[in-house]
C-alpha cells in the first residue's frame, strides 16, 4: 500500500513481456521521426534499407525471441513501403517536413490554462498552408467523430498551428488533416 499510494510506484512488467500496442506504436513513430529528421532523399534506392536499419535499431530490444522481433520488423517493412510511397507521391508539393513537433498554447484568460499538443507531422505545402498528419497504428477516427469533437486531436493541432505555437513554424492555416 505504501509503495502504491504514498510513493505512487507502479508495477513494472517482467523482463521478456511483449510490448503493448501503444509501445510498438511509439517505436514506429520514432522510426518515422528519425527518418524525416535525417532528411534523406526519398527517391534514392537506399531510402527503404536506411529506414529498416533505423527500425532494427529501434526494435533491438523488442523481444528476447528473435523470431518475434522479426515478425514486427516484417510488419514495419510493409508500413515503411507505404510510408515511402505516400511521401514520394506528395514530395513535389511539400516545402518543409516537421516531425513530432510539440507546441504549447497559453490561455491567460482561462487561469493560465495551457493546451499542449504533439503533432506527428506538420508539413508546409507550396501554397503556404499546412497538412497535419497523424500516423495511426491502431484504429482511425471517423470524420463524424472529429466534427463532434470526440476525436479532437487534429482539429486542436490546426488551431494551434493557426496561433503559431509550434516552434519553427509561423502561424498558418491548415489545408488538410490526414490520418495515415
Describe every region a protein language model picked out:
Residues 1-34:
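C-terminal, charged and often intrinsically disordered regions of DNA end-processing helicases
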Residues 2-9, 52-56, 123-136, 179-180:
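Active-site-adjacent bridging/hinge elements
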Residues 4, 29-36, 77, 81-84, ...:
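Short, well-ordered alpha-helical packing segments
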Residues 8-12, 33, 37, 138, ...:
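Short, well-ordered loop/turn and helix-capping segments at boundaries between secondary-structure elements
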Residues 16-27, 47-55, 72-76, 111-115, ...:
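Secondary-structure capping and boundary motifs in well-ordered enzyme cores
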Residues 27-108:
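A non-catalytic, helix-rich entry segment at domain boundaries
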Residues 45-52, 96-98, 156-180:
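Substrate-binding beta-hairpin/strand module that engages nucleic acids
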Residues 98-165:
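Non-catalytic protein-protein interaction segments used by genome-maintenance enzymes to assemble
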Amino acid at each position: 500500500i505504501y509503495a502504491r499510494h504514498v510513493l505512487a510506484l507502479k508495477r513494472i512488467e517482467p523482463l521478456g513481456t511483449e510490448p503493448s500496442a501503444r509501445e510498438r506504436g511509439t517505436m514506429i513513430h520514432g522510426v518515422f521521426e528519425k527518418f524525416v529528421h535525417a532528411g534523406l532523399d526519398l527517391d534514392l534506392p537506399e531510402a527503404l534499407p536506411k529506414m529498416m536499419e533505423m527500425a532494427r535499431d529501434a526494435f533491438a530490444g523488442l523481444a528476447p525471441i528473435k523470431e518475434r522481433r522479426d515478425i514486427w520488423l516484417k510488419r514495419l517493412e510493409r508500413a515503411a513501403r507505404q510510408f515511402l510511397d505516400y511521401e514520394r507521391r506528395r514530395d513535389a508539393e511539400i516545402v518543409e517536413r516537421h516531425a513530432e513537433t510539440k507546441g504549447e498554447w497559453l490561455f491567460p484568460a482561462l487561469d493560465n490554462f495551457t493546451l499542449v499538443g504533439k503533432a506527428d507531422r506538420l508539413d508546409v505545402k507550396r501554397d503556404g498552408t499546412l497538412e497535419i498528419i497523424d500516423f495511426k497504428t491502431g484504429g482511425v477516427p471517423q470524420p463524424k467523430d472529429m466534427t463532434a469533437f470526440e476525436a479532437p486531436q487534429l482539429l486542436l493541432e490546426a488551431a494551434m498551428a493557426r496561433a503559431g505555437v509550434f516552434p519553427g513554424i509561423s502561424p498558418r492555416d491548415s489545408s488538410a488533416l490526414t490520418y495515415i
